UniProtKB/Swiss-Prot annotation:
Species of the source: Lachancea thermotolerans (strain ATCC 56472 / CBS 6340 / NRRL Y-8284)
Protein name stated in the entry: Ribosomal lysine N-methyltransferase 5
Entry keyword set: Methyltransferase, S-adenosyl-L-methionine, Transferase
PANTHER family for this protein: HEPATOCELLULAR CARCINOMA-ASSOCIATED ANTIGEN (PTHR14614), RIBOSOMAL LYSINE N-METHYLTRANSFERASE 5 (PTHR14614:SF109)
Binding site for S-adenosyl-L-methionine: W88, G155, A156, G157, D177, W227, M254
Length: 334
């Protein structure tokens, strides 16, 4: 089955969740019945990604990740906000799906996708997540510069897998999370930076850069961004998440929806970013990955996003996703 989008309105949310949780019951014997931590037994993980025959991305990736199980269970670390200290299953699933599945290809490269539930459209034109600008751009040229392709990750945690792998395919990648998690994130990025091998890499926040034999480059940075305080004191964004010119900005979030208290701060941050990027003449959208645990929390998130924050939320419908405990959502402003 080719992937399609299903636009969710207030009534459609209940139908969508009924279908997804029914599929969870159907596949219950094949799925792990846990919270989704990749490993509860080891502080050091090896995670590999291999292309399948016919995959649109041919590169393979091997990561060695240091996580902190003691910090996960601590009541003192990072003001008791500790889920980011370990690796959660949504991230490797999404990366494998985006890079190697036929359904993920349309999101990476852009293109036309069927949509259900929109009375005005039978299909949407998706902007590409991936794209390239060469290192030496002639600034004196009258030809408009090609748009940058940027990923801003909200709630990156300490793993660093998404940023290192996907920085191979975009012009700029900014990982954001709470301050207490950033040192662990930086260490994992540095340890696995050899997996960023298709581009030169520059950074203003990491203590190293890399040079490759290519005209392509990426900027890779790490930024403290707390949803509860974001945008309250100033309407200006940090320069790292402010595009310098016309850009396509993808906001990624993996497994950040797991209790009701985070829903409003996350959605407020997401909407502010999307609206500001659009007002500045950029193309912006978000992809959110959720592990389907408590149905009430997922329902509250989707309802709050659609009704209170008036965001356009589409479920990504794909047979590969249907067989898992994960949900992927494509989100834009109205």
């Amino acid at each position: 089955m080719t992937a399609k989008l299903k636009l969710l309105d207030e009534d459609g949310i209940y139908e969508h969740l009924f279908e997804r949780y029914s599929l969870l019951q159907k596949h219950a014997n094949e799925l792990k019945q846990d919270l989704g931590i990749v490993s509860r037994s080891s502080g050091d993980l090896e995670v590999s990604f291999e292309p399948q025959p016919g995959s649109h991305v041919k590169e393979h990736f091997n990561f060695e990740i240091a996580q902190s199980l003691s910090s996960l269970n601590s009541s003192r670390d990072n003001n008791n906000s500790t889920t980011g200290y370990v690796v959660w299953s949504t991230t490797p699933f999404f990366l494998q799906w985006l890079l190697y599945s036929p359904s993920g290809a349309i999101f990476g490269k852009g293109g036309t996708i069927e949509v259900e539930g929109d009375a005005s459209h039978s299909a949407y034109e998706l902007p590409a997540i991936f794209g390239s600008r060469t290192v030496d751009t002639d600034e004196s040229s009258d030809v408009p510069a090609a748009p940058q392709h940027i990923i801003v990750e909200l709630g990156a945690g300490i793993a660093g897998m998404l940023c290192v792998a996907l920085a191979n395919y975009v012009d700029k990648y900014v990982c954001t999370d709470q301050k207490g998690l950033l040192n662990g994130l930086k260490r994992n990025i540095k340890h696995n930076i050899d997996e960023l091998r298709l581009r030169n890499m520059e950074s203003s926040t990491l203590d190293f850069e890399i040079s490759r034999r290519t005209a392509l480059k990426t900027e890779l940075d790490v930024l403290d961004l707390d949803w509860e305080s974001f945008g309250l004191k100033s309407s200006n964004f940090h320069t790292l998440i402010t595009p310098a010119g016309p850009s396509t900005v993808c906001i990624l979030s993996m497994d950040v929806v797991y209790n009701e208290f985070l829903i409003a701060p996350y959605l407020r941050t997401l909407k502010k970013l999307l609206q500001t990027y659009e007002k500045s003449g950029n193309t912006s959208f978000a992809i959110l990955g959720i592990q389907l645990r408590d149905q009430d929390v997922v329902e509250m998130f989707l309802s709050t996003a659609v009704v209170q924050f008036e965001l356009k939320v589409c479920a990504i419908v794909d047979s590969e996703i249907d067989k898992t405990r994960f949900g992927l959502y494509y989100i834009t402003t109205q």
